[in-house]
Amino acid sequence: MKAHRAQHSIQLAVTQLEVTEAFYAGILELPVQRSLTAAGAPDHLMLDMDGIALVFVEEDDVVRAHPVLGNRFSMFPRGIGVTLHFEVKDIEDISDAITEEGLEILYPLEIKPYGIKEMWCFDPDGYLVVLDEALQNRKKAGS
C-alpha cells in the first residue's frame, strides 16, 4: 500500500471496494492498490495513471463525509456520463472473464480498422469501460 500522491485525481463512488478491486485488479489486471489512509479517512482504492489517480471510494463513506451528496446519489445513478478508457493485455481472456461474470457488454470484442482490438462494457457499478489492446502487427505512425 502506498499513500495517494498524484497531482490530480478523479474520485468515483462505488458500492463495495472488494467488488471494484475484483473487477479492475482481478479481471482487467490493472495496478489497483489499496492506499494508506489518515486516521478517520475512508478506505479507498487507487489506480495511478501517469500522474493522474483514479480513486475509488465507497458511496456510503462519501455520504458519511459529505451528507449533502446523499440526495445527489439517490437522484443520479453511478456511471452516468462517465467513460473510462484502458489499454489492457490479453483482451480475449478479459472478454471471456467479463462474460463469465455476467457483466453487461455494450459492444463485444472486435478488431477495429485502426489497429486495435476493442470492447465496451459496464463495471459492477455501471461505469462505462472501454478496453483496447494494440494488434501485434500494428505499425507506429511515421514508420
Where are each of the predicted segments found?
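Conserved active-site region of classical short-chain dehydrogenase/reductase
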Residues: E18-E21, E92
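Vicinal oxygen chelate
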Residues: M1-S9, P31-H85, D93-F122, E133-S143
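Conserved active-site tyrosine of GNAT-family acetyltransferases
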Residues: T20-A25, I98, G126
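Short glycine-/small-residue motifs
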Residues: L128-L131
